[in-house]
Amino acid sequence: MCPPQAQAEVGSAMTEKTEMVCTSSPAPAPPSKPASPGPLPAEEVDHRNTCNPWLPPGVPVINLGHTRPTGAAMPTTELSAFRPSLLQLAALGTAPPTLALHYHPHPFLNSVYIGPAGPFSIFPNSRLKRRPSHGELDLVDGHQPQKVARRVFTNSRERWRQQHVNGAFAELRKLLPTHPPDRKLSKNEVLRLAMKYIGFLVRLLRDQAAVLASGPSAPGSRKPPAHRGVEGNARCGAGHRVEAARSQPVLPGDCDGDPNGSVRPIKMEQTALSPEVR
């Protein structure tokens, strides 16, 4: 039998260990190393023989009273070392729900362009222009046929205007002389060549008008216009008589008392010209 002092030491050690195990966390304790089957120290063998005489020989027995001092307390640094990791795991476990609040499953219904911008948006809504998608355009067009009709009319009018402008440029291009006749010109070149060509024609007409105005013209080259009527016939008759009198030959002996035979002027011109002719 063991002495009462040894039994008291063993009992106190066992109670301390049970209290420490109960107060510790449920973390698994490291497995204890099995005792080697080698020979035991002489002190343990003597103590085993004295305290536990009922155990068979060869069974290893560890004396708790000698391995750990009685007044020593188990350090809690190893148990407290696991607590920060548990807190970190708990914090990480609660983080995904906060991110899930800002996650939009459908980009069409909740997007940056339509819905309110979250804290993770790069640009504010004031700088972004709303551009509806194709599906939204179809929905809007289906509910507003007037806008569709107005859009179709605007597109057709713009197409018609563009066709007329192109036709006018083609007609103007045909009137412009170019060195290669089949030279392709842009609209800008057509307009510039048209301006130059029009200016050239204006200068040409101006020069021709100046030449015609400053040209020499004889005073008797132009014939008076023929007037029909009694006055015109009388003038024509008097003129014919004057020409006939001038064309008659004058004889040298037929002079009125002029022995020298000098030619006297014929006074028929004065008699022929009546006051009406003058």
Curated annotation (Swiss-Prot):
Keywords: DNA-binding, Nucleus, Phosphoprotein, Transcription, Transcription regulation. It holds the Pfam family HLH. It comes from the Eukaryota. Residues 1-52, 213-278 are annotated as: Disordered. Residues 149-201 form the bHLH domain. Residues 27-40 have a biased composition (Pro residues). Efficient DNA binding requires dimerization with another bHLH protein. This is Protein lyl-1. It comes from Rattus norvegicus (Rat).
